[in-house]
Swiss-Prot record:
This is ATP synthase epsilon chain. It is a peripheral membrane protein. GO terms for molecular function: ATP binding; proton-transporting ATP synthase activity, rotational mechanism. It comes from Nitratidesulfovibrio vulgaris (strain DSM 19637 / Miyazaki F) (Desulfovibrio vulgaris). CDD domains: F1-ATPase_delta. Keywords: ATP synthesis, Cell inner membrane, Cell membrane, CF(1), Hydrogen ion transport, Ion transport, Membrane, Transport. Belongs to the ATPase epsilon chain family. It comes from the Bacteria. F-type ATPases have 2 components, CF(1) - the catalytic core - and CF(0) - the membrane proton channel. CF(1) has five subunits: alpha(3), beta(3), gamma(1), delta(1), epsilon(1). CF(0) has three main subunits: a, b and c. InterPro entries: ATP_F1_dsu/esu_C_sf, ATP_synth_F1_dsu/esu, ATP_synth_F1_dsu/esu_N, ATP_synth_F1_esu_C, ATPsynth_dsu/esu_N.
Length: 134
């Protein structure tokens, strides 16, 4: 039996990560799910949040802004709208984005404006959580 997984995280712009890992935890729409080696194949939609993986006894965090995860043959492929490693997140930029989203949410007059502001707030807060977890 295989003792590791190959994790790839891809965005429309770039390959964010490609490495052997021991475990992957991801933010699914129905809640967080975990993947160990030899997991049954499946496909899941991802929510905005924290994806983490364990490799070499360390836990690593990555912000993902939605997308999909596919598990097959000890390979986890994440296709994300955007993804950032914890160490690459600009915390000050995330704080400013959070403040702007909160202001837009308070001033939203239409349902669409409110939904966009809520999504922006969720992304900013997830980035801040991931950066804090690093």
């Amino acid at each position: 039996m295989e003792k590791s997984l190959h994790l790839e995280i891809v965005t429309p712009d770039r390959l964010v990560l490609s490495e052997k890992v021991d475990y992957v935890g991801a933010p699914g729409y129905e809640g967080e799910f975990g993947i160990l080696p030899n997991h049954i194949p499946f496909l899941s939609a991802l929510n905005i949040g924290s994806l983490y993986y364990k490799a070499g006894g360390k836990t690593h965090w990555i912000f993902v802004s939605g997308g999909f995860a596919e598990v097959s043959d000890n390979k986890v492929t994440v296709l994300a709208e955007s993804a950032e490693r914890a160490e690459d997140i600009d915390l000050e930029r995330a704080r400013k984005a959070k403040e702007r989203a909160e202001q837009r949410l308070a001033q939203a007059k239409e349902k669409l404006d409110s939904a966009r502001a809520q999504a922006a707030l969720q992304r900013a807060m997830a980035r801040m959580r991931v950066r804090g977890a690093a």
